[in-house]
Amino acid sequence: SDMDSLYREMSLTIETQFIQGLSEPLTGETWQARLRELIDRRITNFETITPFKRAEAAYRHRSRFLQSDLQRMNTWLREALIRVLPESIRQDASRFEILDLLLSFESWDRLRRDQALSPDQAREALERAVDALLA
């Protein structure tokens, strides 16, 4: 359909920009510093793609392409997180899964839209949750 073509085009553009924005090597000297960098990059990218992801969400249930697009993005985000974390955290399944959830687009979008937090407030909330989880 025309809508599917439109969303496919939009989705590919978002994915390209998203991956470019997150694929630069992380420069932090410790895994904690690299994790902070990763969080910063995600937040910057999430803020950019939010209007598109919200529009896409309304149509996703009717589009296999958009469903697979979401899965691809989540897999990519998860793999980036795995590369940053030490084995002790990767092996702790519940901590890793909670961290993956906290740093997802869905968490960011809920903080921004449903809980009406500013970008700075949402960032602080996520950083505090991550710090508490990793303490």
PLM segments and residue spans:
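A short secondary-structure junction motif
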Residues: M10-G21, I49, K53, A80, ...
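Alpha-helix C-capping/helix-to-loop hinge sites
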Residues: P25, E87-S88, D109, D114
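Amphipathic C-terminal alpha-helical segment
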Residues: F96-L117, A132-A135
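Short, solvent-exposed positions on alpha-helices
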Residues: E9, E97, D120-Q121
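Amphipathic alpha-helical linker/stalk segments
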Residues: S5-L38
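Amphipathic alpha-helical packing segments from all-alpha helical-bundle domains
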Residues: R36-D40, T44-A57, R62-E97, E124-L134
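Phosphate-coordinating loops and pocket residues in cytosolic domains that bind phosphorylated ligands
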Residues: R8, A58, R113
